[in-house]
Design a protein with these regions (language model features):
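Conserved phosphate-binding elements of NTP-dependent enzyme cores
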Residues: 1-201
C-alpha cells in the first residue's frame, strides 16, 4: 500500500472511468456512474480503518472526524505504528475546531469556502506549526461566526500572541476588539482614538 493509492490525482488511485474528476465529464456536474463521485477506484475504497474507507472519513465534518479518530479502536501493534500519525491528525482537527470550522466537511472543495473560512483554515495551519516571531494580518476573521466560536477564535489568537507573535486585525466585533492589547480606531468620528485598551475604551 502506497500513499498514491489514495490520491485521485494518481493513476494508481483514481477511478479509471472519470480519471479522478468524480463527474461524467469535465463540463458536467453529474456524478461519475462508476465511482459515484468518490473519485477513487475500488482498490483504494476497499481499504478501511475503523470500518471506514478514506472517502467515508473525508465526507465527515471536522468535529465528527475528530470524534472518530479519538474513539478509534485499534490493536496494540497498530497503535505503535499509527500513534504519531493519529496525534498529528487529531491536533490538526482540533486547531480547525478552535477557529470555528467544526461544521466543514473534510472533502469540501476550496473554491466553495468563504473568504473568512479560507482565512481561518490558513490560520489553523499556522497555529499547528508553532511558529514564533511572526506577524499575522487578518481581515475580519470573526465574520459569520457564532458567539461561542468567536470566543474559541479569540482564545486561539491570544495563544498565538502569548507564544511571541504579533497579530493585526481589522475588526468590527466588539468582543474581539476588547480582547486586543492595542486599538487603533479609523473612520469618521474616530478622532485621536488609538492606544492601549484602557485609554480607548
Amino acid at each position: 500500500i502506497e500513499p498514491r493509492l489514495f490520491s485521485f490525482n494518481s493513476p494508481y488511485g483514481y477511478c479509471s472511468a472519470c480519471n479522478g474528476l468524480g463527474v461524467e465529464n469535465i463540463f458536467s456536474s453529474t456524478p461519475c456512474s462508476v465511482c459515484g463521485g468518490k473519485r477513487l477506484n475500488p482498490n483504494a475504497l476497499s481499504i478501511k480503518v475503523g470500518g471506514k474507507n478514506i472517502w467515508e472519513v473525508t465526507d465527515m465534518t471536522i468535529d465528527k472526524a475528530l470524534d472518530f479518530f479519538n474513539n478509534l479502536k485499534i490493536s496494540k501493534k497498530e497503535e505503535e505504528i499509527a500513534n504519531v500519525i493519529l496525534k498529528e491528525i487529531t491536533n490538526r482537527l482540533q486547531f480547525l475546531i478552535d477557529v470555528g470550522l467544526h461544521y466543514i466537511k473534510l472533502n469540501r472543495k476550496s473554491g466553495t469556502l468563504s473568504g473568512g473560512e479560507a482565512q481561518r483554515i490558513r490560520l489553523a495551519s499556522q497555529v499547528g506549526t508553532k511558529l514564533v516571531g511572526a506577524l499575522y494580518v487578518l481581515d475580519e476573521p470573526t465574520i459569520g461566526l457564532h458567539q461561542r466560536d468567536n470566543e474559541l477564535l479569540v482564545n486561539t489568537l491570544r495563544n498565538l500572541c502569548d507564544i511571541g507573535n504579533t497579530i493585526i486585525i481589522v475588526e468590527h466585533d466588539e468582543n474581539t476588539i476588547l480582547a486586543s492589547d492595542w486599538i487603533v480606531d479609523f473612520g469618521p468620528g474616530a478622532g485621536k482614538n488609538g492606544g492601549d485598551r484602557k485609554s480607548v475604551v
